[in-house]
From Swiss-Prot:
Gene3D superfamilies found in the cross-reference section: GroES chaperonin (2.30.33.40)
Classification of source organism: Bacteria, Pseudomonadati, Pseudomonadota, Alphaproteobacteria, Rhodobacterales
InterPro entries the record matches: Chaperonin_GroES, Chaperonin_GroES_sf, Chaprnonin_Cpn10_CS, GroES-like_sf
First-listed, main subcellular location of the protein, grouped into a coarse class: cytoplasm
GO biological process, one term: chaperone cofactor-dependent protein refolding
Family: Belongs to the GroES chaperonin family.
Classification via CDD domains: cpn10
Location(s) in or outside the cell: Cytoplasm
GO cellular-component term (any): cytoplasm
Keyword Translocase found: no
Organism: Ruegeria pomeroyi (strain ATCC 700808 / DSM 15171 / DSS-3)
Keywords for this protein: Chaperone, Cytoplasm
Quaternary structure and partners: Heptamer of 7 subunits arranged in a ring. Interacts with the chaperonin GroEL.
Protein name as annotated: Co-chaperonin GroES
GO molecular function: ATP binding; metal ion binding; protein folding chaperone; protein-folding chaperone binding; unfolded protein binding
């Protein structure tokens, strides 16, 4: 099943968080924070102005992005957990 976001929505795959601290301690899953960065999997075509003019998306598939801790809605596609969020929830592109 493929999921294509509509309008100004973006589908993001979270990057995995570190398993160990800098000191070598292993972090259990229950203590890990969900990462607030990920890779864009798919994008909608963009939002539209009242005049109907399309506002192009600033992000594209493959971009590494930074987003807020509580951004997006978790969705499962083909057994993989992804986040669906508005483009405005993305704070920046990591280069």
């Amino acid at each position: 099943m493929a999921l294509k976001p509509l309008h100004d929505r973006v589908l993001v795959r979270r990057t995995e968080s570190e398993e160990k601290t800098a000191g070598g301690l292993i972090i259990p899953d229950s203590a890990k924070e969900k990462p607030s960065e990920g890779v864009v999997v798919a994008c909608g075509e963009g939002a539209r102005k009242d005049s109907g003019e399309l506002i192009a998306m600033a992000v594209k598939s493959g971009d590494r992005v930074l987003f807020g801790k509580w951004s997006g809605t978790e969705v499962t596609v083909d057994g993989e957990e992804l986040l669906m969020m508005k483009e405005s929830d993305i704070m920046g592109i990591i280069e």
